[in-house]
From Swiss-Prot:
Pfam hit, one: bCoV_NS8
PROSITE patterns to which the protein is assigned, alphabetical: SARS_ORF8_IG (PS51964)
InterPro entries, A to Z: ORF8_betacoronavirus, SARS_ORF8_IG
Entry keyword Protein biosynthesis: no
Cellular localization per UniProt: Host cytoplasm; Host nucleus
Name by which UniProt lists this protein: ORF8b protein
Task performed by this protein: Non-structural protein which is dispensable for virus replication in cell culture.
Length: 84
């Protein structure tokens, strides 16, 4: 399942944006990923940094489909657009 949301992603001084945040089907061992734990605002906008570049795994609170409660998920951020 992918949610259409805005993600601002900074790596190596470049900023990327993506409209997709894909929830993984299972919980991964978080220590295996060279990432930062990210806490998201209710509108699911996040800022992430990954020194290695490319996609990353971020952990995020988000509101799903208008529900009043948030779910804690591991999410895959897929880069698809570079912005200035």
């Amino acid at each position: 399942m992918c949610l259409k949301i805005l993600v601002r992603y900074n790596t190596r001084g470049n900023t990327y944006s993506t409209a997709w945040l894909c929830a993984l089907g299972k919980v991964l061992p978080f220590h295996r990923w060279h990432t930062m734990v990210q806490t998201c605002t209710p509108n699911v906008t996040i800022n992430c940094q990954d020194p290695a570049g490319g996609a990353l795994i971020a952990r995020c609170w988000y509101l799903h489909e208008g529900h009043q409660t948030a779910a804690f998920r591991d999410v895959l951020v897929v880069l698809n657009k570079r912005t200035n």
